[in-house]
Amino acid sequence: MTDRVILTIGTKKGVFVADAAKPRRSFALRGPFGPGVPVYSTLIDTRGTPRLYASSCNPFFGMKVLRSTDMGKSFTETKSAPAFPKEVGRALANIWALEAGGGKKDLWCGVSSGCSGGGRVAGSAVRSSDSLHV
């Protein structure tokens, strides 16, 4: 990844990925991925095999986390959508920030309502108190 630069861009129309090889005279732009859905946060996760993540907020279908394992050539939705546990009685409004967690597969999310939480991207083993399932 050191021989090129990758830039992720979250917009109201989805996520775009721009990349360039050295000496960065021009960038190739791909996207939008998750078209028509606002993306408020993106993350380039360099732990192990590099991955790109984007949070998408669809007013009808809710929150999704998009993942790219090929450095932005394509994106897929993670197996589970982020959500509060049912017993908390809260709905997730938006993911404002994504951050790599302490474990190899942990992804932390900063969400509206002033909560942060995280867990394994596949949807198991939550790594926060009782706040947010990813």
Predicted regions and their residues:
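Extracellular glycan-interacting surfaces
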Residues: M1-V134
